[in-house]
Swiss-Prot record:
Binding site for hybrid [4Fe-2O-2S] cluster: 249, 273, 317, 405, 433, 458, 492, 494
Reaction equation(s) it catalyzes: A + NH4(+) + H2O = hydroxylamine + AH2 + H(+)
Organism: Escherichia coli O6:H1 (strain CFT073 / ATCC 700928 / UPEC)
Protein name per Swiss-Prot or TrEMBL: Hydroxylamine reductase
Pfam families: Prismane
Keywords, in A-Z order: 2Fe-2S, Cytoplasm, Iron, Iron-sulfur, Metal-binding, Oxidoreductase
Lineage of the species this protein comes from: Bacteria, Pseudomonadati, Pseudomonadota, Gammaproteobacteria, Enterobacterales
Originating gene: hcp
Length: 550
């Protein structure tokens, strides 16, 4: 096992990365190794997808499957080894079908890629794990060095984050052939074990630029189906009655669940990155979408254990449900998996609803505590002139984009302290689950404009980018000249690709934490600092002083 893709990875003087029987996320060595094998098969599939496009062959089944299966290897998504192997077998079957299509056009069709003809050696998981050793990401570290390995992983993990967003968009009916062609090209190239530093750096920026387009179509999918989010108050306390909790990012799953629970007497609560769903008109119209439950994903083993109903996980993040003994009432959807937990193959939630009706639910309603969400792209753009006016009258000094992932590391309290230290004449724009560090606190307003503005899920960084570009255009300056600072927390691969997206768009002087990614060496961090001004957090006092004086 070698995995260094998330923020909580093991860090020792001998090197970074989880390399024992189990990773810090709870992923076993078996599952981790089989995910490496799956990625290798997906690189071979992409190699043939690139070749097929040369013949004008575009297979939508291949295009939809490839990023979805890649998504299953993202942190805290799928821990079920047999399902990982199932994805690998499906990848090979699709590859062979695509290969046959190419050969039907050109009998001499060939692909020069080491993954292009990969076959699984056995049905036995142990044998497959041994085969997976050929594809461990750091297998040639001694030959290429830590810097090249780090750049490879930056590209691989960034592309994985983009693949997740591609799947979210595809679920909503969004498909862009150019994006998929670019994805396959990059994925196939990474399967050749590239070792050119400049080419890898260029690839990382290409991934960022591609992901901006992915976030654009995801935004179109979400707003096209569920309307543009508008500011909405959400109760974060319990309401009496039977209940279901839904977590993850998939708004379509939430919509289907709301439709199927309507009139059943079962209330629905959002958790984690589902919180922004309350801002969408077509979702909040369901009166039994009663509120948001819990806090950051890392607290789920305590909070889910206390929830008196079933739980549905639609994407990341799931962690071991046996710890809180709720494994009999947690359900996985789509690419999510945990051994022994019931999985929903389709969009029928009747079994979950039946379980909710058999459980006690909340016995009484608590005193409501309301927070505000729903500052989507349209709302943010509508406030652009107000922001400019406040700045011109010196009522608004600075905007801090304070967002990203949450996690268990104690150093993450920095983000709570930072938020509470932001001066009263400054505004906090937040997104993603890092907001749970401070989103239940009171921040007041500036002439009626809330000082805490919740822009949505991690992918809604797109809305923040569009706002920044709009403000810069109106003020006749560059984005980096705005009174705007980005202070980002990271945990997994979606955060990595958001960072690459920002860097590829030329955004500079981003501050990140709580730690630097374990796969980025001091040399690589120095390059990113020199090129983009990217740096790690220090202390709240020092960072605040530096950012306000910039």
């Amino acid at each position: 096992m070698f995995c260094v893709q998330c923020e909580q990875t093991i860090r020792t003087p001998a090197g970074n990365g989880c390399s024992y029987a189990q990773g810090m996320c709870g992923k076993t060595a078996e599952t981790s190794d089989l995910q490496d094998l799956l990625i290798a098969t997906l690189q071979g599939l992409s190699a043939w997808a690139v070749k097929a496009r040369e013949y004008g062959i575009i297979n939508h089944d291949v295009d939809s499957f490839a990023p979805r299966a890649f998504f299953s290897t993202l942190t805290n998504v799928n821990f079920d080894s047999p399902r990982i192997v199932g994805y690998a077998r499906e990848a090979i079957a699709l590859r062979e079908a695509l290969k046959a299509q190419c050969l039907a056009v050109d009998a001499n069709a060939r692909v020069d890629n080491p993954m292009a003809d990969l076959q699984l050696v056995s049905d036995d998981l142990g044998e497959l794990q041994r085969q997976a050793a050929e594809f461990t990401p750091n297998k040639d570290k001694a030959a290429i060095g830590e810097n090249i390995l780090g750049l490879r992983l930056l590209c691989l993990y960034g592309l994985k984050g983009a693949a997740a967003y591609m799947e979210h968009a595809h679920v909503l009916g969004q498909y862009d052939n150019d994006i998929y062609a670019q994805y396959h090209k990059i994925m196939a190239w990474l399967g050749t074990w590239p070792a050119d530093m400049n080419a890898l750096l260029e690839c990382s920026m290409e991934i960022g630029q591609m992901n901006f387009k992915v976030m654009s179509i995801l935004d179109a999918g979400e707003t096209g189906k569920y309307g543009h989010p508008t500011p909405t108050q959400v109760n974060v306390k319990a309401t009496a009655g039977k209940c279901i909790l839904i977590s993850g990012h998939d708004l379509k799953d939430l919509y289907n669940l709301l439709e199927q629970t309507e009139g059943t007497g079962v209330n629905v609560y959002t958790h984690g990155e589902m919180l922004p769903a309350h801002g969408y008109p077509e979702l909040r119209k369901f009166k039994h979408l009663v509120g948001n439950y819990g806090s950051g994903w890392q607290n789920q083993q305590v909070e889910f254990a206390r929830f008196p109903g079933p739980i549905v996980m639609t994407s990341n993040c799931i962690i071991d449900p046996t710890v809180g003994a709720y494994d009999d009432r947690i359900w996985t959807r789509s690419i999510v998996g945990w051994p022994g937990v019931r999985h929903l193959d389709g969009e029928d939630f009747s079994a979950v609803i039946a379980q909710a009706q058999q459980m006690a639910g909340f016995p009484y309603s608590e005193i409501p505590h309301l927070i505000t969400v729903g500052f989507g792209r349209q709302t943010l753009l509508g406030a652009a002139d107000t922001l400019i006016d406040l700045v011109s009258r010196e009522k608004l000094r600075h905007i801090f984009l304070l967002g990203g992932c949450d996690g268990a590391r104690g150093e993450r309290h920095y983000f709570t302290d930072f938020a509470t230290s932001v001066p009263d004449d400054c505004l906090i724009l937040t997104l993603a689950c890092g907001k749970y560090r401070f989103n239940k606190l009171e921040f007041g307003d500036i002439e009626g404009l809330p000082r805490l503005v919740d822009a949505g899920q991690c992918n809604d960084a797109y809305s923040a980018i569009i706002l920044a570009v709009t403000l810069a255009e109106k003020l006749g300056c560059g984005v980096n000249d705005l009174p705007l600072s980005l202070v980002l927390s990271w945990f997994e691969q979606k955060a990595i690709v958001i960072l690459l997206t920002l860097l590829s768009l030329g955004v500079k002087n981003i501050v990140t934490g709580p730690t630097a990614p374990g796969f980025l060496t001091p040399d690589l961090l120095a390059v990113l600092n020199e090129k983009f001004g990217l740096r790690s957090i220090t202390t709240v006092e020092e960072d605040m002083k530096q950012l306000l004086s910039a």
